[in-house]
Amino acid sequence: MYKNIDDIRQEFLNFFKKKGHKIISSSTLIPNSDQTLLFTNSGMNQFKNIFLGIDKPLFKRVATAQRCVRAGGKHNDLNNVGYTERHLTFFEMLGNFSFGDYFKNEAIQFAWELLTDVNWFNLSKNKLWVTVHNCDGESYDIWSNQIDIPNEHIVKIGSNTNDFCDSDNFWQMGNIGPCGPCSEIFYDRGDRFQGGPPGSLEEFGERYVEIWNLVFIQFDRQENGRLLSLPMLSVDTGMGLERITSILQGVNSNFSIDVFKKLISSISRIMKINDIYINRSVYVIADHIRACSFLIQDGVLPANEGRGYVLRRIIRRAILHGKKLGVNDIFFYKLVSPLIKYMQHIADILHEKKDFIAEILLSEEKLFQDTLKRGLELLEKQLIRLKGNCLNGEIAFNLYDTYGFPFELTQDVCLKRGIHVDQEGFDQAMLTQKKYTKELNKFDISYEKLSLCNVSSIFVGYDKLICKSRVMALFQNNKSINKIYTKEEGIVILNNTPFYGESGGQIGDCGQLNTISGFFQVSNTKKYGQTIGHLGIVNSGTISVGEEIVAQVDQHKRKCISLNHSATHLLRAALSQVLGSHVTQKGSLVNDRYLRFDFYHHATMTTTQMNTVENIVNEQIWKNAPITVDVMPIELARNSGAVILINKQYDKKVRVLKIGNFSTELCGGTHAEHTGEIGVFMITKECSIAAGIRRVEAVTNNVALSAIHQYKMLLKNIFQSTQSDDKNILSKIHEFKCRYQKLEKEIDTLRNQQIIQQSLSFIKDVYYIKDVRILVKQVVNMTSKTLFNMTDCIKHQLKSGVIVLINLNTNKKINLVVAVTKDLIERNRINALSLVHYIIKILGGKGGGRPDFAQAGINNMATTSKISIEVNSLLHNIL
């Protein structure tokens, strides 16, 4: 009986539900408790802390259908998608898990029953092969004696090296920690496919397909490589839904299963393509729209780093494959609707964000179109200057690295012109860049350490702004010292301090440190691991290690910072209300003068949206709501609904900041006690800082009041200057604008008349080389627009000929404009671009353009008369 993909998923879950398993929903594609992963890439990710012994399992038996993405980091299938029948960036992983309950025997029995029983998947037993680790005799015996699978269908896989764990049939989470042997189940697709059984020399063919991996977690690997037995034996299995669907539906490819067939059919209709099953670009697009839509749904937005960068790569890869299919119009966002239609089982998740997902994809596609246009223009300039038929790899890398222009597109453009691209040079430039980035990171780490980690500082500044302390260490120029003298700068480390160290976007405190022997002015405070460093200068006396000290924070500055920090939390919550739940923090700055908040959003905020956000924040301020802090375990905070930054590492216990019933977030910063202390909130700026990332700047309290006064004064000056008031200021500005535009038109008319007259006067200087009319003329201080208009006017008068205008600017820079009429180009006599290239070769400089019009800047500071002679000589040689 035919089963669609939804039937197969549900059948898997129903089977394990009958076997006493709790069915757990898929987690998001952003791992909540594992910052080492870019994306959720397997079913076990959400249970990792259980396997590590950090969390206790709520259920002993669990089964899931987990959404996964493998498009970055260790598990990256992105470049394989579309070129193999199996690889996908987005897929679902079916899995059953046991946490200290059943082990190998039951896991193998369950797998065999589901796969072969007539009431379930009903696969032929003769088609199934299994592999086991060659030292896992227990699994081998179960397969051989209890399942009664033929011994020739059981393959023992050894280690690749002398290391027992270095085997395809041994799973480990990392170099240390939980691990164990695994048993993989393969399906034989028949002799119409090439390839041999697993473990053979021909195993990499298409005939034998791995469909299920059963991992038996029984060891704890130590740093020295020893394997200790775990007290709790666990099972972790994974079976790709799309792959098992292809087997059960009797098709040869993941892209031929029901959900992909429907999606690909819609893609072909929307993109107006034929032969969809011949061109693999369609496979790429079908896979990528799934990955992109679910990533955006789970909170990932296009960016220049991290998860957002991977998403941007996937989007752009899909667009490039669209271009390979001859589709140059914007199309990708249109595929969201059919995707939702055909993925019914999770359509509800996507449907509520359908418009938002489409908007993000449309915005990113438009941005990439601009990138491609700019990149093609830059590439064209490089190809014009090219000597020979090989484009330097560094140039191709610069286009890729600086302008985001894809290397494969550079190759395509060059290939059409018979130009080779230096792949080796590109790869070398990429390697150099990676090494440079690595070195920068190394520098950051070494600076962070500063050997300060030997001293832990206790922060007491939540409750007090002045306290007694002791100098534990002093640093100068990254070196530990015992004393700092008058007018010397340094870093002071205390055993406890009221000074807040710069972190979480909040700047460090300022203030003073007083001892019997000296006075230290603190200009900034920074955190170095568990150490808090006070940066500043000794204003008088000396500061020595071991001295008792009185540490006093600048109270006014701290108060302003705290007000702005609380306002930032109100701003974030208000932005989420107005713009949508996708608003997540990308960065922030909180100081005593203003606050800055960077967040994911795809469009410029409208005036109405900004006013609404302002009003919401001010309403919360005027409520004078209490601001409270609770310290709790991270898991409890997560379950409470507190906003948690995905990419940030947190301690086991965290501070949860609650502002009335309006905002709940994790925060280690300092805050007001009530919102009323903030006084007033005003947005001063909203802008883009990167594709998909917006920035809002705002002020509060007295700074906001000062800003209002400044705006009032500015408005008063405008009224006086325009002789208007608040009732007619807009009409006055409109009147001035119309008058200005009218004068501009009159000036343009006069300028054009002058150009025509001057052009007519030039005609008398036309001369012939052979039968071609030539005009070479020197002009002074003309703008590019005037030069273009004059050239156009002379062309119109000449009808046929070559025009060269040599323009000398007041800064003594020379630029040329060359124009050639259409008839001469068609007769292959000459073209403007070739002429400019000849001139640049002799006189030096840079230039470019079209066959009918080109221009150049001349580096050589020769006189214009000399240039005229060279140009004339060139024309004689060419013609």
Swiss-Prot record:
Keywords: Aminoacyl-tRNA synthetase, ATP-binding, Cytoplasm, Ligase, Metal-binding, Nucleotide-binding, Protein biosynthesis, RNA-binding, tRNA-binding, Zinc. One of its GO terms (biological process) is negative regulation of DNA-templated transcription. It catalyses: tRNA(Ala) + L-alanine + ATP = L-alanyl-tRNA(Ala) + AMP + diphosphate. Its EC number is 6.1.1.7. One of its GO terms (molecular function) is tRNA binding. It is found in: Cytoplasm. Its cofactor is Zn(2+). Binds 1 zinc ion per subunit. Zn(2+) binds at H565, H569, C667, H671. InterPro entries: aa-tRNA-synth_II/BPL/LPL, Ala-tRNA-lgiase_IIc, Ala-tRNA-ligase_IIc_anticod-bd, Ala-tRNA-synth_IIc_core, Ala-tRNA-synth_IIc_N, Ala-tRNA_ligase, Ala_tRNA_ligase_euk/bac, DHHA1_dom. GO terms for cellular component: cytosol. It is an enzyme of class 6 (ligase). Homotetramer. Belongs to the class-II aminoacyl-tRNA synthetase family. Consists of three domains; the N-terminal catalytic domain, the editing domain and the C-terminal C-Ala domain. The editing domain removes incorrectly charged amino acids, while the C-Ala domain, along with tRNA(Ala), serves as a bridge to cooperatively bring together the editing and aminoacylation centers thus stimulating deacylation of misacylated tRNAs. Catalyzes the attachment of alanine to tRNA(Ala) in a two-step reaction: alanine is first activated by ATP to form Ala-AMP and then transferred to the acceptor end of tRNA(Ala). Also edits incorrectly charged Ser-tRNA(Ala) and Gly-tRNA(Ala) via its editing domain. This is Alanine--tRNA ligase. It comes from Blochmanniella pennsylvanica (strain BPEN).
